[in-house]
């Protein structure tokens, strides 16, 4: 749990990940970035979207915020988007102000039912906890698609308004990484009811590796921010930064041709340190022999996750419009 600076200045530091967070010897975690938590709303005044929080699992603790846009009629069926928030596996939340504001807009503009997953964060819960939570939550949501295997804590919005023939997953940055690995797992394992993913939305995906790609600088690569983040959130990762979870082309990584979806949309931003890695990922998927369609949308002059921080700009509106066109 994060503590205020005033109560931690005298504590002994165990380790830290500047400028994101610090861990103290007593186990206290102090986070320096990330937006404040906000409650769900029966009706957002800007978009008319209704939100509520649900419990998916009590052990481990996995929950979600569900977004339901204004309905044309009480029996309307909507596409479903299971969304994994970003934050370097150690920051942010499905209940944060930034993601609440952003997903209200996405749900409204795309007319989609969004299930935003609250997975466990590092360092309290080092990876692969977030991947395990993401997969558990995905199976829980898809179990609503069949009458025989509905969970005991089934959600009425999903049952009444979810169209499981239009079922998508996606996320931003580390959340896009979780979505990618979930899509690979879907290609190898069956979801409840044999459900298939209609597409994957990958916004500024967090991938990395021991060798620079494209125009990534060679000098300083070993001390790059993504490498420091990965070593912090998954210190025991087999293969380190070339673990297949973070490097999809690492030795032993699953073949990208096995991605369990028919289409993918990848976003990159010109001023983002992850730009080249996102383009590299797009090219790798396209050349893998995968039978699906992958599209790349580039926003030159924009920063990492600009659409979340500044959803009012023209480029953000364009990006959200592309999402709406993708989620059909």
Swiss-Prot record:
Disulphide bonds in the chain: none
A molecular function (GO) term: carboxylesterase activity
Alphabetized UniProt keyword annotations: Flavonoid biosynthesis, Hydrolase, Lyase
A Pfam family annotated for this UniProt entry: Abhydrolase_3
Active site: 173, 272, 304
Motif (Involved in the stabilization of the negatively charged intermediate by the formation of the oxyanion hole): 85-87
Job of this protein: Dehydratase that mediates the biosynthesis of isoflavonoids. Can better use 2,7-dihydroxy-4'-methoxyisoflavanone as substrate. Has also a slight carboxylesterase activity toward p-nitrophenyl butyrate.
Similarity section: Belongs to the 'GDXG' lipolytic enzyme family.
PANTHER family for the chain: 2-HYDROXYISOFLAVANONE DEHYDRATASE, ARYLACETAMIDE DEACETYLASE
Protein name: 2-hydroxyisoflavanone dehydratase
